[in-house]
Amino acid sequence: MIAFNSLFSLDKKRLKKLQRTLNTINSLKGQMATLSNEELQAKTTEFRKRLVNGETLDDICAEAFAVVREADERVLGLFPYDVQVIGGLVLHQGNTAEMKTGEGKTLTATMPLYLNALEGKGAMLLTNNSYLAIRDAEEMGKVYRFLGLSVGVGVSDNEEEDRDAATKRAVYSSDIVYSTSSALGFDYLIDNLASSKSQKYMPKLHYAIVDEADAVLLDMAQTPLVISGSPRVQSNLYKIADELILSFEEQVDYYFDKERQEVWIKNQGVREAERYFRIPHFYKQSNRELVRHLNLSLKAHKLFERGKDYVVDDGEIKLLDATNGRVLEGTKLQGGVHQAIEQKEHLNVTPESRAMASITYQNLFRMFTKLAGMTGTGKTAEKEFIEVYDMEVVRIPTNSPVRRIDYPDKIYTTLPEKIHATIEFVKQVHDTGQPILLVAGSVRMSELFSELLLLSGIPHSLLNAQSAVKEAQMIAEAGQKGAVTVATNMAGRGTDIKLGKGVSELGGLAVIGTERMKSQRMDLQLRGRSGRQGDIGFSQFFVSFEDDLMIESGPKWAQDYFRKNRDKVNPEKPKALGQRRFQKLFQQTQEASDGKGESARSQTIEFDSSVQLQREYVYRERNALINGESGHFSPRQIIDTVISSFIAYLDGEVEKEELIFEVNRFIFDNMSYNLQGISKEMSLEEIKNYLFKIADEILREKHNLLGDSFGDFERTAALKAIDEAWIEEVDYLQQLRTVATARQTAQRNPVFEYHKEAYKSYNIMKKEIREQTFRNLLLSEVSFNENGDLQIYFI
């Protein structure tokens, strides 16, 4: 029986309900154990028949869980604990299970994945990296295959492998798929760039379990997945803008608020720019690109910090994941920011590419019929999980009591004091032989602590974005006697740290944090590296008034206190501030930081709603064309719409003496180069009929030439128009968001401004699709090559 004493009252009620189902599952244990392998495997077919006959997943849940539990033991030698069954039930219900480090989330997922896969609509488990997806699919896949289900892996251990549509279709048609969140997102975007049925592979998104759910669904929610296409014309303004920004004086030429992460050019800076470039009006339309590049350069210098937001590796800017400090391979900032950072670091500026398609994790995962999550730290963000994803967070009891001691923070006035105190504490703990995990907030700070430990003669390993290739080995050794591992917060998630021989007697793993992170969940993840599965251990954080958290989110009185007392301390004789108000201060500041993060993610949802509506519309129309269904961009309808719109334009806006020129121009630009002209005496109705006649003749001629391939031609003409317009729209909306955010400084609501402009652009895009489809149908040249393949040349 599970003890509920330590849980929130709401969790008590939830868990009591789940306890009844657990009791039923436990009562089936003996029955399942008596079944032969063949009889146990036959249960899968039985369950599927029962679902077809009208039973629901909830009806068969207890029995299905009991089957998987028995299969887990027979195949893996692992029998899920009661707490793991409870976690599996939470996942089946479409909620997030908060399970502490080492509690066996991988095994827990086998039960809800099996159950939900029985419907034949697909079930996915999405991990943080390819290694985990491949490993878990291989290990847990043995259980699913034993029970007659197919298993696919959406990633490859060969990064160079380029999977074709047929391979991906085979993966996604599997009963259960293991992949990563990013791989799924990019596959979704690529699938919606397909031009034929044979190139499509993605099923409807049905059920998914997201590992490290808070990191993916919350912390990474603002990071868009972007497929880039053809490059923009390379700009030489990055270098010029960078030179001017370097000469600017903070708070004189530009305003910078580190707390709010806002920066913009002030009036004095505008005057300096006008003098520098010898232009009379800085914000004139013709100077738009110059203004854009200056703002990009300003952002690069003030909002992006080397060693914290990115590293320079082999002449390239590599972004760091804010949630775990890992390098985001293959990821670039959009809208020119990446190029501005390259210029700031005096690297070769890479071409700025257009965004062909993009989607945020929020919108990707909200497309699933049922979504569940697993994490070690989700409870503090339950309100946001409910509001954004309609997912409750249920804290699952640990199988063994948590024996880790979390000590109150040691608080210092200045950064040098804190660093000195931290190193002295590390020396004391190291002398006992107790293993230490020392966690810094950035690559730069981790390297500083590493240098200080070297000077102190303490051997250690350094784990950060620059040394991530050795991560698994370092983590495996971090729990050994006498080990000291210096790491960024990338050590907070991933492989468990197992204690070496004799370490428990020394007190277990010591986790030493050198600053509070921006989110309480990150701190909880770091603390959770110690005390795994009932192990002994402790955590201790060292903080100061100069930490990023306090600078960016601290109250004014704290900043005043620092200015008043910073010169009164001796860094070599650090003095901890023991008053209760300071402990409360750092706790409240972190809560404020969490609130800002939630607010920023909420704004991302508001911004992205316009893009999501447009994306759904475009993808729906594309799929209708590919599947041969009637949609808004049916070629036949477009001919009528475009010609009718042109006649309405002639009737309302064109003088009679300009009529012939306008009609001839329309024919030449959109329909045919064989211009025969029209008579002055023709009425608008006659002109309309004349244009329809030209269109019908051109299409009849192409139909006669292409025969059965004419439908393919029509579809290709419309798809090409949609794709060209959508690429322009995605790119424009990215630029628009940057501009709209900047308008906040002019006392305007950035979201309102964005939606207003996005709606205008949306209508322009639809008009452009119709007109370009019209041109593609009529002005294109078609033929067959010597192999009999259809060739289309669009003008």
UniProtKB/Swiss-Prot annotation:
Places the protein is found: Cell membrane; Cytoplasm
GO biological process: intracellular protein transmembrane transport; protein import; protein targeting; protein transport by the Sec complex
First and last residue of the signal peptide: none
The EC number(s) this enzyme carries: 7.4.2.8
KW Protein transport (keyword) present: yes
Purpose of the protein: Part of the Sec protein translocase complex. Interacts with the SecYEG preprotein conducting channel. Has a central role in coupling the hydrolysis of ATP to the transfer of proteins into and across the cell membrane, serving as an ATP-driven molecular motor driving the stepwise translocation of polypeptide chains across the membrane.
Name of the protein described by the UniProt record: Protein translocase subunit SecA 2
Taxonomic source organism: Streptococcus agalactiae serotype V (strain ATCC BAA-611 / 2603 V/R)
Gene that this sequence comes from: secA2
